[in-house]
Amino acid sequence: MTTSSRLSRILWFAFAVLVLAGTAAWGYRVATLPSFEDQRNVVPLSTVWGMHACLVAVIAGLAGVAMPLGRILGRRRCLTALGLAVAGYLACGLAPGITRIFFDEHIYAQIGQTITHTGRAESANYARVEYGQFEMYSANINKQPNGLPYLLSWIYRIAGVSDASSHFLNRALVGLAAAALYLGLALVPWKLPAGAGLAAALLFIFTPLVLWWGHTVAVEPPAAATVAFAFLAVCAHARLRDPETAQGLPASGLLLAGATAFAVYFRPESLLVFPLVAVVLWSTDDRFIEDLSAWGALALATALAAPNLLHLWSVRDESWGARDGRRFAFDFVEKNLQSNGGYFFDSHWFPIAGTVLAVVGALWLLGRNRTAGVALATWFAMAWGIFILFYAGGYFFGASSRYGVVSCAPVAIFMGIGVAALFGLLRRVPVLAGGLAACALINWAAAMHYVPTMSREAVEAQADVDFIARVAPTLTEGSVVLSPDPCIWLLKGINSSQIFTLDEMVHTQMKELANQFPGGVYLHWSFWHNAEPTMAAESAKLLVETNAIPIARVQCQAYKLGLFRIDTPEALARFGGKEPAPPYHDTDLDKMLARARAAQVPAKPAPAK
């Protein structure tokens, strides 16, 4: 190793440590703010800037290693990776482009809308969105990390806010994740059977659960994809290390730091990407602990992930829906293990052929490359096993199956190794190989039966989303809708608020509210009104008190949905409050015509002849 290269590594490590020290000082400053609310208010901006920094690190690092990686991979592998990315995007079109988690996916998209216009990662309790502008009146910090909304914000900046642009992202990420797995396995210095990388990438794409969730706006496909990118980055760093000294390049360390930190911003358990990176480095060279560039990557990745750590700390008291407050406990293991383990054997979500291939791959690694097997088993154990401890981590319902997507990448690698190993073993027995391949394809195709479907538990909620999509274009400009789900209306370009946010104004200043929104004040009788009796009773009372005017109604199963106008004459008389201040120049057409007619001098009658 030359003196200059050693110096560059020392400078890289010093830079990373300096950034980490600066981040620690910033964290201490935030921790000493006078109130918890002040500390929490830092989160919406700091998380966005943290992800900006991650992208800068990734792009800069990639620029530094593009040439050596290009020489190693060659044109054929690069074109194959491009083909996999396109194939993954197109394959996700087999599933319907809908939302399956109600209404988390709309919250993610609406936060992306907010980031687009304000640069802050907040969901809107009350906002005005008209004429391409967005104005936040009442914000809320979502408990989930903001990686998905951040990526959506870039799509929205380019293509605008729409269902099509929202669903484009996950489809693209599925394809890119497959390409990352292929390139990572091409780069990692593991001994693997020929063709394992390509087989793993294709099997990842056509994993039924990946396709089913790949055409939604759920966070699990991006979470899986960003961990796959981190896997690619660590494989690149391991491949570019000096084989004699085990020292990595600063540029690949920068890429590794940015990719690892960025993966943290998608789900709370995404923090487990750190031990994944460590075990992959160990599996490629047990001298990894001597790699100064890797230590620099760890320091910088920790600094880049700090804003998300602050976010998670700020929502530490959230129940996440756990009725007794226990989010993780060993008491959930038995029940969750039945469903999550059964995923591989009951042929409901996953083909049994895939399980057989994964077992073959694991056995091949056990005999030929145990360190690689340990690394992949660790990845799977963390990505799949963490949900066994989670109170809602079992695949009991269609929506819960999304957690299985997070572990699909390591399972696909095991399957890919299994396919490649069997092909190498049976290629001289084509009849047997063809018969086994046909059986596997039949089983796989049969397991994809649910890919083009929705799911029963989502029907009523999807009907509410469809109802909003149909009604929103009929509302006039300057309207506002009170709804338990303002995010959906805001995404459709309609001003909206949580009911509780404007409740006092509705009951005391209806005239002022109607003055601010001359297009009308509306109440959305939603999916939640059918599920929450207290909310339904309060809204029904308001509709009666205002003699609300029905605008649209629809029924799905036993759920009734509707939109009502509540700024009626009765509402203005009962809840009107103080008259709004008159405009400085009153130029209303009808008023001006009335004044002109009143001021007109009657014409003199014509003289009698």
Segments predicted by a language model, with ranges:
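Hydrophobic/aromatic-rich transmembrane helices and adjacent perimembrane loops
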Residues: 44, 50, 109, 213-214, ...
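Hydrophobic, aromatic-rich transmembrane alpha-helices
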Residues: 58-69, 177-182, 281-283, 348-377, ...
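Transmembrane alpha-helical segments
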Residues: 90-91, 270-271, 418, 432-460
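Multi-pass, polyprenyl lipid-linked donor-dependent membrane glycosyltransferases
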Residues: 103, 168-173, 199-229, 234, ...
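Transmembrane-helix motifs of polytopic, lipid-linked glycan transferases
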Residues: 165-190, 229, 233
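Transmembrane-helix signature of polytopic, membrane-embedded enzymes
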Residues: 181-206, 224-225, 245, 427-437
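Perimembrane helix-loop-helix junctions
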Residues: 233-245, 249, 272-302, 363-369, ...
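Membrane-lumen/periplasm interface segments of specific transmembrane helices
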Residues: 268-275, 283, 291-358, 383
